């Protein structure tokens, strides 16, 4: 079993890794002034909300794993033509 920190850095476990890194970098670059990083936080929050909805739907349908793998997520996003968040 992976530790929580390692799981959060794993692309298969964390669908919003890119958004996580962007918001962290913004905070580092702006000396932790949250107001300057609000757009990054909103994008991260919307990303989590979107993939949580996908996960709930898959769980309801009995699809395993509940969270799509990184490869599956790539295909889902490509089929949408633009990022939903």
Curated annotation (Swiss-Prot):
Domain CHCH positions? 13-55
User: Does this entry carry the keyword Mitochondrion?
Assistant: yes
Does the entry annotate any disulfide bonds, and if so which pairs? 16-47, 26-37
Quote the subcellular location field of this record: Mitochondrion intermembrane space
**GO CC annotation:** mitochondrial intermembrane space
Principal localization reads mitochondrion
Record motif Cx9C motif 2, residues:
37-47
Checking InterPro entries in the record gives:
CHCH (IPR010625), COX23 (IPR051040), Cys_alpha_HP_mot_SF (IPR009069)
Motif Cx9C motif 1 residues? 16-26
Which keywords does this chain's UniProt record carry?
Answer: Disulfide bond, Mitochondrion
The record's similarity note reads: Belongs to the CHCHD7 family.
**Protein name (Swiss-Prot/TrEMBL):** Coiled-coil-helix-coiled-coil-helix domain-containing protein 7
What organism does the record attribute this protein to? Xenopus tropicalis (Western clawed frog)
